[in-house]
């Protein structure tokens, strides 16, 4: 459990007058025990509502300072200092005064401000909905008092059952997954309402989380210029892949894992879940006014695995770019070849590579490969590493065989971080590591450097 220790300090003239403080009004200092105790208790209502936290414009450094400057509606100001150890709130004050309501108000407003996540800056019209209130209630829990002393009050943030639930990260994430996105690196929670506007970048550690193909199209392609291709192409079951012989009498449907479902059933499930027909979207559009052909793989659709339809769509895109003399971009996010299609999926590696050979060698056109996390298997072994320029996202997981497969096959430990983009960049595997927020501008400059220019003068 964590403890938040609060030492309240005053620095306002009015409070100094009312509390009888002898400390200088121009400096910070702890509240000293005074005989004017009733004056604080009787006037306690003026602190029942804290309007805002000062210095909200610098929220990135807000938590690192560990000191909160708080002002209420009557312009009475004071600061709160805390250090996190356990999930128990402890208010440590140096007097007999009844500061409990004041500090409780501060805690309440701070938690609300964290749930809002810069709502006062991003959207002044932001209002709480029922789901937000549920999360706030869950975080705050039932406030109860523990053992009291002359110098310290302990406020427990949750009861026993809530503590057990809070420690269960899986239950917490599942319960509120419609509101939060959990970072895979630091396990911090990102508020989903503003997660897309932050390009799926963790606000706690800066890690680049997975992004859907539709979001990437919106990020890279100029508005109103996207023209999809081959949207009606869907996968069949060419080898009639069925992992198990289903017995409707003996098999409990609840115990049926998604990996054991028939291939067609899994395809239908992912199509309904993602709204996509396959694990890649292909089409044409403009980047800063420059016409491009682009294919974007989607890891949410069967792990971005490359089957016969994925290979065919990418091959047709390359052939179209070859005929139209367009620059080509392929954004890779894949677990490799799709095992449910056997050798047909492996054939796509050679087919795509052959089309790229004609595009790059014979026609002398420009292909940019963008490797996102994860890029593994057959995609890494084929078109993922064939770009004229190869760009990787920060901290992307890029490999041919995964860490678990290598360790089980070779019975040796894979060094931590040896399959990260930064490590591989030092070994010369990529041309550049580009953050997501700079990617569009970098692509525009690369295209212009290689002789591809905007269609209009105001295309930049």
From Swiss-Prot:
It is found in: Plastid, Chloroplast stroma. Keywords: ATP-binding, Chloroplast, Fatty acid biosynthesis, Fatty acid metabolism, Lipid biosynthesis, Lipid metabolism, Metal-binding, Nucleotide-binding, Plastid, Transferase, Zinc, Zinc-finger. Residues 179-460 form the CoA carboxyltransferase N-terminal domain. Its main location: plastid. GO terms for molecular function: acetyl-CoA carboxylase activity; ATP binding; carboxyl- or carbamoyltransferase activity; zinc ion binding. Gene3D superfamilies: 2-enoyl-CoA Hydratase, Chain A, domain 1 (3.90.226.10). Binds 1 zinc ion per subunit. GO terms for biological process: fatty acid biosynthetic process; malonyl-CoA biosynthetic process. Signal peptide: none annotated. The keyword Electron transport does not apply. One of its GO terms (cellular component) is chloroplast stroma. It catalyses: N(6)-carboxybiotinyl-L-lysyl-[protein] + acetyl-CoA = N(6)-biotinyl-L-lysyl-[protein] + malonyl-CoA. PROSITE patterns: COA_CT_NTER (PS50980). A zinc finger (C4-type) spans 183-205. It is an enzyme of class 2 (transferase). Its EC number is 2.1.3.15. Its cofactor is Zn(2+). Pathway: Lipid metabolism; malonyl-CoA biosynthesis; malonyl-CoA from acetyl-CoA: step 1/1. Zn(2+) binds at residues 183, 186, 202, 205. Pfam families: Carboxyl_trans (PF01039). Component of the acetyl coenzyme A carboxylase (ACC) complex. Biotin carboxylase (BC) catalyzes the carboxylation of biotin on its carrier protein (BCCP) and then the CO(2) group is transferred by the transcarboxylase to acetyl-CoA to form malonyl-CoA. Acetyl-CoA carboxylase is a heterohexamer composed of biotin carboxyl carrier protein, biotin carboxylase and 2 subunits each of ACCase subunit alpha and ACCase plastid-coded subunit beta (accD). Belongs to the AccD/PCCB family. This is Acetyl-coenzyme A carboxylase carboxyl transferase subunit beta, chloroplastic. It comes from Cicer arietinum.
């Amino acid at each position: 459990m964590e403890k938040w220790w609060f030492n309240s300090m005053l620095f306002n003239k009015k409070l100094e007058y009312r509390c009888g403080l002898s400390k200088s009004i121009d400096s910070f200092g702890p509240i000293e025990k005074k005989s004017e105790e009733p004056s604080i208790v009787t006037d306690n209502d003026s602190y029942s509502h804290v309007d805002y936290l000062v210095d909200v414009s610098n929220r990135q450094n807000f938590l690192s300072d560990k000191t909160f400057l708080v002002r209420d509606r009557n312009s009475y100001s004071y600061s709160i200092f805390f250090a996190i150890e356990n999930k128990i709130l402890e208010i440590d004050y140096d007097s007999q005064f009844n500061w409990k309501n004041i500090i409780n108000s501060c805690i309440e407003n701070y938690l609300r401000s964290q749930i809002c996540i810069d709502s006062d800056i991003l959207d002044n019209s932001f209002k709480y909905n029922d789901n937000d209130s549920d999360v706030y209630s869950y975080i705050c829990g039932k406030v109860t008092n523990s053992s009291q002393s002359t110098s310290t009050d302990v406020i427990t943030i949750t009861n026993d059952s809530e503590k057990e639930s809070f420690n269960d990260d899986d239950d917490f994430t599942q319960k509120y997954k419609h509101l939060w996105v959990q970072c895979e690196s630091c396990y911090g929670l990102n508020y989903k309402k503003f997660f897309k506007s932050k390009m799926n970048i963790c606000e706690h550690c800066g890690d680049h989380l997975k992004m859907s193909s539709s979001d990437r199209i919106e990020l890279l392609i100029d508005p109103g210029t996207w023209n999809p291709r081959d949207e009606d192409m869907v996968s069949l079951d060419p080898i009639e892949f069925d992992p198990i012989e289903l017995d409707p009498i003996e098999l409990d449907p609840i115990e049926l894992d998604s990996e054991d479902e028939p291939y067609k059933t899994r395809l239908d499930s992912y199509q309904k879940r993602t709204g996509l027909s396959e694990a890649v979207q292909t089409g044409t559009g403009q980047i800063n006014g420059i016409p491009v052909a682009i294919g974007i793989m989607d890891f949410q659709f069967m792990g971005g695995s490359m089957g016969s339809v994925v290979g065919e769509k990418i091959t047709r895109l390359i052939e179209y770019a070859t005929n139209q003399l367009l620059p080509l971009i392929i954004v890779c996010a894949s677990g490799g070849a799709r095992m449910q299609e056997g050798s047909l999926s492996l054939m796509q590696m050679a087919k795509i590579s052959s089309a790229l050979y004609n595009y790059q060698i014979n026609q002398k056109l420009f292909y940019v490969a963008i490797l996102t996390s994860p890029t593994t298997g057959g995609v890494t072994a084929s078109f993922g590493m064939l770009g004229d320029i190869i760009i990787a996202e920060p901290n992307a997981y890029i490999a041919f065989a995964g860490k678990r497969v290598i360790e089980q096959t070779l019975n040796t430990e894979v060094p931590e971080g040896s399959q990260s983009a930064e490590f591989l960049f030092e070994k010369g595997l990529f041309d550049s590591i580009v953050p997501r927020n700079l990617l569009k501008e970098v692509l525009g400059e690369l295209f212009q450097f290689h002789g591809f220019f905007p269609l209009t003068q105001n295309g930049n």
